[in-house]
Every structure is written in C-alpha cells, then in structure tokens.
C-alpha cells in the first residue's frame, strides 16, 4: 500500500512475528511516540496538529454541539414547520452531496475499469465479491446470534407504539424489480427514476355452469316414460338457460409498470462497469474517452474539497433536527429500548470487531489508525444516513488521507455503496426475529436459514437510500410468513438505527477497499509496468528485450556449468 502523509491517524506497519504480537508491538510503539511528542510539544506543534486534523475536529465538534443544542431546544416544543426551518442548513448539505453522487459514480467506475486490463479487473472483482459475501453473511449471523441471546421481544407487543404505514410488496416482484433496475432502458431516466412495480385492480367476469342442486347439467337424466323424459328435458333446458345468464364478477390485483423517484444507482453501476471495460479494451482508441472521464472525476473531487468545509455545519443541523422531530423520547425505553440496544451491540461487534479483524489478518497492520482516518466519512454517514451521499467524503478520506490506490477506490467504493450493506443485512435479520418474538412465533432452523438468505439478498437491493432497510424488510418478513404490518412497531427508533447501520456500511466498504488493494498489489504493479513501458520508446524496449535474452542465455550456461 502506498505511503501516507503525516496525520494524526497514520496506519502502523505490521511487525513480523505473530499477528497478536505485531499488534501489541505497534500499540506500544505508538504509545511511546505519543509520550515523546507530549514531552517535546510546542505551540507550533499544536498549530500543525490543528491544521492537519481540522476536518475531523470540526465534524466531531458539530456532532457534540448538535446533540446538545437539540436537547436544549426540546423543552420549547417547536412546531413541525419551525423544525424544518431549523434543519434547512442540513438539508442543503444533503442536496450538495446528492448532486455529486451521480457524476462521481459514473466517472469513477468508468476510469477505474478503463485503467485496468480485463484479467486484473476479473481478479479484483472476484476478491470484492468474496469480501462482500463473507462480511454480509457474518453480519447476518451476528444479528441472529444477538437477538437470540438477548431476546428483546420477550413479552407482548400490545405495549409497543405503532407508527407509520408499511406497503406490502410480494417477494417475487421485489426481486424482479431489482433485476429490471440493473438494465435500465433509458439511461437519462435512470438518473432520476427507478423501476418499481405498482398494483392496480381489474374486474374479471366468469360464467359458471351448474344446476340448482350443484350437479352438472344433464347428469340426473334417467330412461323412463316419454312424458317424464319430455318434462325432464324441459326442466334441464330451463335450468341451462337460467345458468348461462348467471355471471360472476370479482376484482383482481395485477402488477403494472411504475416508477419511483431516486437515482437508479444499480443500473448506472452496471452500465458504467461495462462501459469502462469496453473503453479499456479499446486501448489507444479509447484514450480520449478515458481522459474525459478522468478529468470529470478530478473536477468532482475538487468540488468535494470545497463542500467538505460546509459539512460540519450541515451535520450539526441534520442531527439536531432529527432529535427535535422525536415526539417522545420515552420510546427508547422498555421493550423497544432493549431492541435498540441489541441492534447497537450487533453493529458494534461487526464494525468494531469483525471488520478490523479482517483488515488485520489480511494486511497485518493496525486497523484502528485506519478507522481513525475514516472518521470524517463515518460522521458524515451518521449525519446523512445514506452511504451514497457519503460517497464523495469516503473517496476523499481513502485517497487523500489514507493513500489507497485510486484504481481500487474507483472500482470498489461505487459498487460497495450499492450492493455491500453489512449493517442493513444485520438489522433486517435481527428485526425479523424480533417481530417473531413479540408475536410469540417460534422459528425453526429452516425458517432462520430462510431469513439469513433473504436478508443477505435483500440487502443488495437497499441501494444506499435512507431507510431502505424498512422497505426491504418486507421481503424478509414475507419469506417466513410474519406480519409485515408489525414493522410499524420499530419505525419510532429506525431514524437512529439507520444512521448507525449506515456508518457500518461505509466502514465495510472502506476496509474492503484497503483489503482488496493489499491482495491486488501484484496486479497493480504489473499494470504500472505495462503503462510505463510504452513511454520508453521502441528502441529502448528492443534493447531491454535483447539484454533479457542475453541474461537468460548466461543463466542457462551457468546452470550447465
């Protein structure tokens, strides 16, 4: 991994020996350096420290001030309109970040795919897919384990407060919409709309043929006298005429094509990956397009550098506004409080234990300085509750703060922000079992396995939009026959938990980029060598080839001798 600039959150190089010994030595060295710095600290050192870490310090201060300001204003019981006015600076930050998401996803993916050959891209893509799958499955397992051990749903659901309304979506239609959105028929429309199945009713009419006694027409005829036969025939004809005029009408719900507002991130990711691979395969013919998207990406990142100074102000008002919107803080107590605590513990174990452990086992480096370098993006994720809106800040932290290779971040981050949702998968599995517990519904091993698989698959469709977990949770509940209307029991705390699971999602994407970069060092070095070699010129390359052949000949002679 490339070297990093001087910062408060430098990554420690892994020492030799065992993994735990290396981590212990790294922490001891850092403590010793910190002690020496404190002893020799001057006013100039303090000034340089503040200048280097201004973004992080301002953002952390904004969170503290926002929470304090919100609780100070709650006794005044502001109206909904006043709260919206108060939250306006935070809304501006969301709009600024969302403005940059679309060009950033397209430009970064196209340049990332075009800068790598197909073989290297395939290997990196396979590593990314394995990482996404492993971390998501572990997250689901942690969620199921926590809700089973703590058992927050013990008791009756009568004491829980319902809030909002949930739209029921058939599982098959939801997954078909996911696949449809991967291939948008109109790229311009994909920039502001997603395909979403709507439902309509139509009147269906059917004619039912039956006799008065429920038997089929003519079934009761028997061979008797001619008079009786004629009477029977007349009766049957009369019944038949009456029956043919009987028509039953009923309403049927049918799916119809529809749309929902919002960027179709999944479709743009699929198109950008394919487009970038094609440009990369065109070699010098695609250089103009590659340079265009590279310049576009650079321009977007410079805009991010400007907007980032406004981020602390926006985060302050976003967090304060959300706390002021809560009607009753008492909902965090009791049964719902235990549910909230269970989710927090699960997310903390995954984000603070599993992900750093994966980073350490793969790279043999101390993960906590790396996480510290991501603090700006993590706090922004908490404020915006959207991994897609946090994407510009995540790029900046990884590339400029931590020095992760741009070819990796441009490939991994946009895809990860769309399909890698560890926090959402953990939350959906945990919430589904919680709803089963409050309904006194015993789940068997097969149903728990179904929840695990469905939560893993449904998290892919969450697409980084705020509170998407509530929408995809309908799929998880439907898969095991749990009542979808009981999602309203947990909406009261979802705004808070949504921010925590977004932080987990962003951290998972960031650590994934670092892990994939470490595993792809050989491909990256070979790619750099191939890009450098053409600039040397044909005479020099032929000379290198001759020297290489001569050295092979000498090596063969030496081996014979």
Swiss-Prot record:
Chain positions carrying an annotated carbohydrate: 213, 229, 236
Q: Which residues carry this modification: Phosphoserine?
A: 2
Any GO molecular function: metal ion binding
Catalytic activity, reaction form: K(+)(in) + L-glutamate(out) + 3 Na(+)(out) + H(+)(out) = K(+)(out) + L-glutamate(in) + 3 Na(+)(in) + H(+)(in); K(+)(in) + L-aspartate(out) + 3 Na(+)(out) + H(+)(out) = K(+)(out) + L-aspartate(in) + 3 Na(+)(in) + H(+)(in); D-aspartate(out) + K(+)(in) + 3 Na(+)(out) + H(+)(out) = D-aspartate(in) + K(+)(out) + 3 Na(+)(in) + H(+)(in)
> Which locations, inside or outside the cell, does it occupy?
Cell membrane
Q: Which UniProt keywords apply?
A: Amino-acid transport, Cell membrane, Chloride, Glycoprotein, Membrane, Metal-binding, Phosphoprotein, Potassium, Sodium, Symport, Transmembrane, Transmembrane helix, Transport
Q: Where does Na(+) 1 bind?
A: 416, 420, 505, 509
Listed binding positions for Na(+) 2 are 418
Disulfide partners: none
Q: What PANTHER family does the entry give?
A: EXCITATORY AMINO ACID TRANSPORTER 4, SODIUM/DICARBOXYLATE SYMPORTER-RELATED
Q: What is this protein called?
A: Excitatory amino acid transporter 4
What species was this sequence derived from? Mus musculus
Q: What is the lineage of its organism?
A: Eukaryota, Metazoa, Chordata, Craniata, Vertebrata
């Amino acid at each position: 991994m490339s070297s990093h600039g001087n910062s408060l959150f430098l990554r420690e190089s892994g020492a030799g020996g065992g993994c735990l010994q290396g981590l212990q030595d790294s922490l001891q060295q850092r403590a010793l350096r910190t002690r020496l710095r404190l002893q020799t600290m001057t006013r100039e050192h303090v000034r340089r420290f503040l200048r280097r870490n201004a973004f992080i310090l301002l953002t952390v201060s904004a969170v503290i001030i926002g929470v304090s300001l919100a609780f100070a204003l709650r006794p005044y019981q502001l109206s909904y309109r006043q709260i919206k006015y108060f939250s306006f600076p935070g809304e501006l930050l969301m709009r600024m970040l969302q403005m940059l998401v679309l060009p950033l996803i397209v430009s970064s993916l196209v340049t990332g795919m075009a800068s790598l050959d197909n073989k290297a891209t395939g290997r990196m893509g396979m590593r990314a897919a394995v990482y996404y799958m492993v971390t998501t499955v572990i997250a689901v397992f942690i969620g199921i384990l926590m809700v089973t051990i703590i058992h927050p749903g013990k008791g009756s659901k009568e004491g829980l407060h319902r809030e909002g309304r949930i739209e029921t979506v058939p599982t098959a239609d939801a997954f078909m919409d996911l696949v449809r959105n991967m291939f948008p028929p109109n790229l311009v429309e994909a920039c502001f709309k997603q395909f979403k199945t709507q439902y309509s009713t139509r009147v269906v009419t059917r004619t039912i043929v039956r006799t008065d006694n429920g038997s089929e027409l003519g079934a009761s005829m028997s061979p008797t006298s001619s008079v009786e036969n004629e009477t029977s025939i007349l009766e049957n004809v009369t019944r038949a005429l009456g029956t043919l005029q009987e028509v039953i009408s009923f309403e049927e719900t049918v799916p119809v094509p529809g749309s929902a507002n919002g960027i179709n991130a999944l479709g743009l990711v699929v198109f950008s990956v394919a487009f970038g691979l094609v440009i990369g395969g065109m070699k010098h013919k695609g250089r103009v397009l590659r340079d265009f998207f590279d310049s576009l990406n650079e321009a977007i990142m410079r805009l991010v550098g400007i907007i980032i100074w406004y981020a602390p102000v926006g985060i302050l008002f976003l967090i304060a506004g959300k706390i002021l919107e809560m009607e009753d803080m008492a909902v965090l107590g009791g049964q719902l409080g235990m549910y909230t605590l269970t989710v927090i513990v699960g997310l903390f174990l995954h984000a603070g234990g599993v992900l750093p452990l994966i980073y350490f086992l793969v790279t043999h480096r101390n993960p906590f300085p790396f996480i510290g370098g991501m603090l700006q993006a993590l706090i922004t994720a908490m404020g915006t509750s959207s991994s897609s809106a946090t994407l510009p800040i995540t790029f900046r932290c990884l590339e400029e703060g931590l020095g992760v290779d741009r070819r990796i971040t441009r490939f991994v981050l946009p895809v990860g922000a769309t399909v890698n949702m560890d926090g959402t998968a953990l939350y959906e599995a945990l919430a589904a079992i919680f709803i089963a517990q409050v309904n006194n519904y015993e789940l068997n091993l097969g149903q728990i396995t179904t929840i695990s698989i469905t939560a893993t698959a449904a998290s892919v469709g969450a697409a980084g939009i705020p509170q998407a977990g509530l929408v995809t949770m309908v799929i998880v509940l439907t898969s095991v026959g749990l009542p979808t209307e009981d999602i309203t029991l947990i909406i009261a705390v979802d705004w808070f938990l949504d921010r925590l699971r977004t932080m987990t999602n962003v951290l998972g994407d960031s650590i994934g980029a670092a892990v994939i970069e470490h595993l792809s060092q050989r491909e990256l070095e070979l790619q750099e060598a191939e890009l450098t070699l053409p600039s040397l010129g044909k005479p020099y390359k032929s000379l290198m080839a001759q020297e290489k052949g001569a050295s092979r000949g000498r090596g063969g002679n030496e081996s014979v001798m």
